[in-house]
Every structure is written in structure tokens, then in C-alpha cells.
């Protein structure tokens, strides 16, 4: 296997909280898939959840080499969790097409947060 993409992003959680306070769920609906949005709505810390997902998707888009736009949408990247809580990443539509162009077959993701920041790193591998 070879690394075909690497991306990292960091988000200030308060910035996301302020946006949610100003605009309600507008950002969440733009960034999160339906399944992610359901979790967001019931989460004990929704702004923290949204910040982590935002960082994860930005990191994934950077690993794909496109950023958000140029055929890759936030909606084309789904961040989930294993039963043990480890984060997972799945690509659809434009993100999957870009991954295929890179000969990528698997994505690895790490997400962390502290009081003020959420950070994510994505590594894409080929076979």
C-alpha cells in the first residue's frame, strides 16, 4: 500500500458555537449527512460534534487534493464510528470519484478535541 493523500484541519470550537447561535442549524445542514445530522440533534454537545465533523471533512477534502468544491461536497464524505467509538470515513459521489482517480481504496481518520479546538487527520492509501 502507498499513501496517496494526506490532509489535516483544525477548527476553533467557539467559532462553530457562535455560528450555531447566530444561524441555528444552517451550517449543520450544509456540512452533515442525514445520519450525522440526526446524531447532532441529539448530541449533548452539538457544537463540539459539528466542529469535529467539519474538521474531519475538511481534512478529507484536503487529502483528496480538491478541498471542498471542485466536485467534492461535505455531503460526499460521511464520518461515522465503529461500535468501539473509533472514527470511520466513507466517500460517495464526487469524493469517491476523486478517491478512485488517486487509486485510493481506503481512508484512515483520527479526530481529537480539547477545550477550544477540534483537529482531524486523514490518510488515503492505495493497494
From Swiss-Prot:
Keyword Oxidoreductase among record annotations: no
Amino-acid positions noted as binding Mg(2+) in the UniProt annotation, renumbered to this chain: 9, 58
GO molecular function, one term: magnesium ion binding
Cellular component GO terms, alphabetical: cytoplasm
Enzyme Commission number, as recorded: 2.7.8.7
TM region(s), chain numbering: none
Cofactor(s) named in the record: Mg(2+)
Keywords: Cytoplasm, Fatty acid biosynthesis, Fatty acid metabolism, Lipid biosynthesis, Lipid metabolism, Magnesium, Metal-binding, Transferase
Entry similarity comment: Belongs to the P-Pant transferase superfamily. AcpS family.
Role this protein plays: Transfers the 4'-phosphopantetheine moiety from coenzyme A to a Ser of acyl-carrier-protein.
Protein's UniProt name: Holo-[acyl-carrier-protein] synthase
Organism classification: Bacteria, Pseudomonadati, Pseudomonadota, Gammaproteobacteria, Alteromonadales
